[in-house]
Amino acid sequence: IDAGLTFPTDEMPGIDTVIPDITYLKENREKVKAVFLTHGHEDHIGAVPYLLRQIDAPVYGSKLTLGLLSNKLTERRVEGDLREIRDGQTVRTKYFSAEFIHVCHSVAGSMAIALRTPVGTIFHTGDFKIDYTPIGGESMNLNRFAEIGNEGVLLLLAESTNVERQGYTMSEVVVTSTLRKLFVENADRRIIIATFASNVDR
């Protein structure tokens, strides 16, 4: 699940990117049946081109996630068997199945993944934000989260930026109304806004 990269610290002169150690995967490449992507941020898909040079496996992700990945593969001249999935879709292999569930995040097409194995369910949330009024209009499927929880989960792998902070993250709707207000108040001035390129809604 996911294969991201990060950027070097000041203590790493001459290094452009930092990718995971995939030695185990290379040594066990016949066991790798698929690559599942939760969303299209660099820290989750950035190392996929390096992985696919070593591992021959289909890559599953949402339409936008695969679109972002496709550009990276083209840049690095790497071929990939990319397979689009949708919310609620299940991918089955001989040994396990993977159900994809929509979650809200700062990039569209984000998914959680419920892996059903012979020993139990492993639930990977991916990055998420509980937003009851998302810009795209599609709320996180918390009902499905509850159903899977009631079925029984062997292991929960949960991630969320700023999870250690108290309180709630504001809805994207609040950001939109704030931006509109700033545009109205500064109609005669130049406005420069920095944001992540992958945050299509903003």
Q: How would you name each of these model-derived features?
A:
Residues 1-36, 41-202:
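His/Asp/Glu-rich metal-coordinating catalytic cores
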